[in-house]
Design a protein with these regions (language model features):
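Perimembrane loop-to-helix junctions flanking transmembrane segments
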Residues: 35-54
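Alpha-helical transmembrane segments and their helix-start/interface "positive-inside/aromatic belt" motifs
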Residues: 2-17, 82-90, 119, 124
Length: 219
């Protein structure tokens, strides 16, 4: 039996990226649980505690199954079998976690904290989560479309054969410029994702600056 041709979706790289994203998301939640005592607002502390409790419950009951699932995906990749559905499940889960963490981070930015260490650490942990998540989304959707003779993204350079690095590069640039640079969306779906990604980053920067000004003025 001949091995399957190499997929442009590169399942091995995709799996490594998504596992890294889930790792940072888990560290974010664990750090949130350790710092709940620093949240001075009672309602905000209750919300944070609820999500942390949901996280610990999920980890306690589903972590063994998730580990087995990831090992199964690795085995399929090693055998050269098609496992894109498994990669997509991990990607969708990371997307859900990314948006939940985004909501929690906004909660921290808008709440009164007894110390600033928790907020700073959570901001740092969120950056790789959102970058890896949106980089994977851009890569998965555009490459899937190109395999069907279409495209969702037009790159300024080397548009015929973009590499995985190109997608994560435009996701990283969004951290600094609030919109993907060096590429443009050619479909409503991708344009919507570009806008959502940019708005999320702009929201965090605006709230962070507002919080910094408030602290500097003694508010």
């Amino acid at each position: 039996m001949q091995p399957m041709p190499k997929s442009p979706l590169r399942p091995g790289i995709a799996l490594a990226v998504l596992v890294a994203g889930h790792f940072f998301a888990s560290v974010f939640m664990r750090n949130l649980g350790a710092g709940i005592g620093e949240i001075a607002d009672p309602w905000a502390a209750k919300i944070a505690k609820f999500f942390y409790s949901a996280f610990t419950f999920t980890v306690g009951h589903l972590a063994p199954f998730m580990a087995i699932f990831i090992l199964f995906v690795i085995y399929r990749i090693w055998r050269g079998k098609n496992i894109q559905w498994g990669i997509d499940i991990l990607g969708v889960l990371l997307t859900v976690r990314c948006f939940v963490i985004f909501v929690l981070l906004n909660l921290l930015l808008l709440s009164q904290l007894r110390a600033g260490g928790l907020l700073l650490m959570q901001l740092i942990l969120f950056l790789p989560v959102i970058t890896l998540n949106f980089g994977w989304l851009y890569w998965r959707l555009d490459t899937g479309a190109r395999m069907k003779g279409q495209r969702h993204i037009r790159f300024a350079e080397d548009d015929e054969s973009p590499s995985p690095f190109d997608y994560f590069y435009i996701a990283t640039r969004t951290l600094l410029q609030f919109e993907p640079t060096g590429a443009s969306g050619t479909s409503r779906l991708m344009k919507a994702l570009f806008v959502i990604h940019g708005v999320m980053m702009l929201d965090l920067v605006a709230l962070t600056l507002s919080r910094a000004i408030s602290l500097a003025s003694g508010g």
